[in-house]
Amino acid sequence: MVTIRLARGGAKKRPFYQIVVTDSRNARDGRFIERIGFFNPIATGQAEGLRLDLDRIEHWVGQGATVSERVSALIKDAKKAA
């Protein structure tokens, strides 16, 4: 099953997440189909905290992809801010 979820990157104690489309059987930070955004939970100042390609998200959801709880909350925040 295809899912849209977070893949962790960054350094120890400084997380940075890619929002990716992947097969649910793949490892959390493993192979993915497409990168559709990022989330920086510790963004400060002028740093961008969240970027999403909403068109691609709608495309993948239309193809039957499931969205993780955290990513769905981020999508909701992005739509509210736009």
Curated annotation (Swiss-Prot):
Record keywords, A-Z: Ribonucleoprotein, Ribosomal protein
One BP term from GO: translation
Coiled coil: none
Pfam families linked: Ribosomal_S16
GO molecular function: structural constituent of ribosome
Keyword Ribonucleoprotein: yes
GO cellular component: cytoplasm; small ribosomal subunit
PROSITE patterns: RIBOSOMAL_S16
HAMAP family: Ribosomal_bS16
Family of the protein in this entry: Belongs to the bacterial ribosomal protein bS16 family.
UniProt name for this protein: Small ribosomal subunit protein bS16
Taxonomic lineage of the native organism: Bacteria, Pseudomonadati, Pseudomonadota, Gammaproteobacteria, Enterobacterales
